[in-house]
Each structure stands twice: as structure tokens, then as C-alpha cells.
A protein has these predicted regions:
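Aromatic- and Lys/Arg-enriched surface recognition patch
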Residues: 74-138
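Residues in flexible loops and secondary-structure boundaries
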Residues: 27-29, 52, 68, 77, ...
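Short, Lys/Arg- and Gly-enriched loop/turn segments at beta-strand edges
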Residues: 66-72
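Alpha-helix boundary/interfacial micro-motifs
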Residues: 72-73, 79-80, 148, 153
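Compositionally biased, charged N-terminal/linker segments
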Residues: 1-54, 63, 118-121, 135-153
Length: 153
């Protein structure tokens, strides 16, 4: 089944999200990450519980110089409080969501965020100062198609 068909099945009403990974101070191109993100979870820094639920899909976005959407992952858990959360530590996340990757490219091999911007919304502006935003069906279909093309080469 194509990725679009998996994510947008009529019998399965799940949400799709654009989720920032990394930061301006520590982008995914930082030597520590080696241009990849392959953790088994996605972290959320704010103390308010994220709306993401098990079965939802997250398109991972590196906002640094690449402005690249490089992965799509399925949430395999609801948000859980991170037992290692430390408010004194830069980048420590209050919530974690476990994920399974459907596509996970090196950051520099992803698609530019402008490639899925539609007439209805400029995603670059919408995601500013947010950790994640819900995507429209059109936006997530575009992201699926373009990521699959990148994967096939």
C-alpha cells in the first residue's frame, strides 16, 4: 500500500502533524546528530499535553538551514511524561511519544517545506514559535508523495 493510502484510509481517521526536530541553537546538522534523527520517540518541551495520539502520523521538520521535512513516523503511544525531564537542562522534553518510522531520510535529503505549502497556508510562517501543527489532508498528501519520490531516488 502506498504511503498516502496508509495514512489516509477512509476507515482510519487519524491526524497528521508537522513536528519540529532540533532547534536554532542545536540543529540536526549539529555534529551530535550527524544529520539524522532516529530516536524511538519524539519529545515535546511544553508542559501542556500534546494533542498527538497513538496512530497519528508526524512529518518531521528540521527548521535550521535546510528547512527540510525528512521523515514520517507513526505515533505508537499517546504522550507520556518523560521520567528524565529536567527543567534546568536545555532541550529537555516534558512529554515523549513513541514512534515507528515509515520513511526516515538524512536531513539533507528531505524535501523543502515550501514544496508542500499550499494556497491556504504558508507552513513556514504557521510553524514559527510552535513545536507542532496539524496538517491538512492536502499538505500531508503532498508530503507523502514527495517523500516517497525522494526515497525511490
Amino acid at each position: 500500500m502506498a504511503l498516502v493510502g496508509k495514512i489516509h484510509r477512509e476507515d482510519k481517521i487519524m491526524q497528521t502533524w508537522l513536528k519540529l526536530i532540533g532547534s536554532a541553537k542545536k540543529p540536526l546538522t549539529h555534529p551530535e546528530y550527524k544529520g539524522r534523527w532516529d530516536e524511538e520517540y519524539i519529545g515535546f518541551r511544553k508542559t501542556r499535553k500534546p494533542s498527538i495520539r497513538s496512530g497519528d502520523y508526524l512529518f518531521l521538520y528540521a527548521p535550521g538551514g535546510t528547512k527540510s521535512i525528512f521523515a514520517v513516523a507513526e505515533a505508537t503511544s499517546d504522550p507520556e511524561i518523560n521520567a528524565q525531564y529536567n527543567p534546568e537542562e536545555e532541550g529537555s522534553c516534558y512529554w515523549n511519544v513513541n514512534v515507528t518510522y515509515l520513511i526516515n531520510l538524512p536531513v539533507n535529503s528531505g524535501i523543502h517545506i515550501e514544496e508542500i505549502t499550499t494556497k491556504q497556508r504558508n507552513l513556514s510562517k504557521s510553524i514559527q514559535r510552535q513545536s507542532h501543527i496539524q496538517l491538512s489532508v492536502e499538505e500531508s498528501r503532498l508530503a507523502c508523495d514527495k517523500l516517497q519520490r525522494k526515497l525511490k531516488g
